């Protein structure tokens, strides 16, 4: 059980509720007896009775005299529609995410919906906890950004619970391979292709790639990077290719880039393809620290057209991300699913990437 500072009966209540919400226990399934639960968690029968009593009162459990306690069936959608929308993104206040959230928020508020915001910090345990919290609310729908979407979905039970509870949801930026729901995203592979194609056409052959591959966006951008090389019949310089995880994003790419730049001129890369603008801006400083300049000594490209992509002396060549528009369209899609009760007819929205050429790249 979690949250050790809570009273024991509330800790137990949360634990049993997680069994139900995650789909570990199904509707009409009998739960363990008071005696079994008390033994399992080393609690008094009174504490167990208190937790079960609250869950029964709230409609999560029901009793049959002489038979035991069972998991309730989901309430019909019409009984719980309070015009409340949950938004769960990897981040809320960082990078491009405020623009996405703002677009969704303004659209939903215009339609009279109340918002619940949560972030996962791209951590699967945090995603589990946030989904658990959201499902406890009387939600009309959810907008969700998957957490480490390339690494599978250990929280699948919660998504199945959303289906069982008839709560529609839309995913943004990526979609878990195991989940079937509408998605609003970029064509990340084509974006990676356009950036790399641009550099190859400028004459670059030793191109370093930095991709965060615990998210599908990074996997797809890497795929585009490789496809551009193949289309131009240019070998991928695998010794200049780096895959990294979310936890390494502030350290590993910078360390590796520094090592690349310290090589003799004839051995170092002539261009960097970065997973996003956030990384590209960090690498601009690494390049400067090595006494090199962009684009004279090395070209660099980012992804997303972040606000700061044009805030420095070097203006980044990048791919434009729809940001606010993505939030608006995700919200509009979800409202349609809620109000028209149509899920099967809703298709994905996939944005075609637009290459923005600025002064961070140069022909060689």
From Swiss-Prot:
Residues annotated as domain HTH gntR-type: 6-74
Cellular compartment(s): Cytoplasm
Keyword Endoplasmic reticulum belongs to the record: no
Molecular function as annotated in GO: DNA-binding transcription factor activity; transcription cis-regulatory region binding
Superkingdom in the source lineage: Bacteria
One Pfam entry name: Peripla_BP_3
Disulfide bonds: none
DNA-binding region per Swiss-Prot/TrEMBL record: 34-53
SMART domains tied to this protein: HTH_GNTR
Gene Ontology terms: cellular component: cytoplasm
Record flagged with keyword rRNA processing: no
Broad class of the protein's primary localization: cytoplasm
Keywords: Cytoplasm, DNA-binding, Repressor, Transcription, Transcription regulation
Function as written in the Swiss-Prot or TrEMBL entry: Transcriptional repressor of the arabinose utilization genes.
Protein name: Arabinose metabolism transcriptional repressor
Species of provenance: Geobacillus stearothermophilus
UniProt gene name: araR
């Amino acid at each position: 059980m979690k949250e050790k500072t809570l009273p024991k009966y509330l800790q137990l209540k949360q634990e049993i509720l997680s069994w139900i919400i995650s789909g570990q226990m199904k509707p009409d399934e009998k739960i363990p007896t008071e005696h079994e639960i008390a033994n399992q968690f080393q609690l008094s029968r009174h504490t167990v009775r208190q937790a079960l009593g609250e869950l029964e009162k709230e409609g999560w459990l029901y009793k049959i005299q002489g038979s035991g306690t069972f998991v309730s069936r989901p309430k019909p959608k019409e009984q719980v529609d309070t015009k409340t929308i949950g938004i769960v993104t990897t981040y809320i206040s960082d990078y491009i995410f405020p623009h996405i959230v703002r677009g969704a928020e303004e659209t939903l508020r215009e339609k009279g919906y109340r918002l619940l915001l949560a972030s996962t910090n791209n951590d699967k345990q945090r995603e589990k906890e946030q989904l658990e919290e959201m499902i406890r609310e009387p939600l009309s729908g959810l907008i969700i950004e998957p957490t480490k979407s390339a690494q599978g979905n250990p929280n699948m039970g919660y998504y199945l619970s959303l289906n069982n509870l008839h709560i529609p949801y839309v995913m943004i930026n990526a979609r878990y391979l195991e989940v079937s729901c509408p998605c609003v995203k970029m064509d990340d592979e084509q974006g990676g292709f356009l950036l790399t194609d641009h550099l190859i056409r400028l004459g670059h052959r030793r191109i370093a790639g930095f991709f965060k591959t615990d998210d599908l966006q990074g996997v797809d951008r890497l795929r585009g990077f490789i496809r551009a090389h193949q289309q131009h019949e240019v070998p991928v310089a695998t010794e200049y290719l780096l895959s990294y995880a979310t936890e390494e994003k502030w350290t590993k790419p910078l360390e590796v880039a520094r090592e690349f730049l310290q090589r003799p001129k004839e051995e170092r890369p002539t261009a960097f393809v970065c997973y996003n603008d956030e990384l590209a801006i960090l690498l601009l400083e690494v390049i400067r620290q090595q006494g090199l300049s962009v684009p004279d000594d090395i070209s660099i490209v980012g992804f997303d057209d972040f606000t700061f992509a044009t805030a420095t002396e070097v203006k980044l060549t990048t791919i434009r991300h729809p940001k606010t528009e993505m939030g608006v369209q995700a919200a509009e899609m979800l409202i349609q699913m809620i109000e028209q009760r149509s899920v099967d007819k809703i298709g994905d929205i996939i944005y075609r990437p637009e290459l923005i050429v600025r002064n961070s790249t140069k022909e060689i």
